[in-house]
Structures are given as C-alpha cells and as structure tokens.
UniProtKB/Swiss-Prot annotation:
Notes on the domains: The cysteine framework is C-C.
Record's protein name: Contryphan-Lo
Bias (Basic and acidic residues): 28-39
Organism classification: Eukaryota, Metazoa, Spiralia, Lophotrochozoa, Mollusca
Region (Disordered): 25-46
Organism of provenance: Conus buxeus loroisii (Cone snail)
Signal peptide limits: 1-23
Superkingdom per UniProt: Eukaryota
Secreted is among the record's keywords: yes
Amino acid sequence: MGKLTILVLVAAVLLSTQVMVQGDGDQPADRNAVRRDDNPGGTRGRFMNILRRTGCPWDPWCG
C-alpha cells in the first residue's frame, strides 16, 4: 500500500509540472513590449545613426 501511495504522488507531481511547463499556449502580455535594439553599436552607434538619418552637418563624423 505504501508503494502505491508513493507512485500516485510521483505521478501527480509529474503531471502538474508538465502542465506548468507547457501552459496553455498564451504569451505573456509584456513579451512584445520590449523594443528591439536597432542600434547595435550602443550609444555611439545610436548617435551616428541619428546623424546619418538627419543628414550630417559635419562630414568627418558621418564616416
């Protein structure tokens, strides 16, 4: 009887962890809220990207 109880408890734990891992297929609400980094060069890359988009007033900075 003791082995049967342990077997039932282990089966219940395995099923509950499977349900928690799989979930119901919904994505978290804030998953798409994070902006994609379109300036991989960091702050300097962002500054250079802004200069390129607006037309650089000083030619050596534009590269």
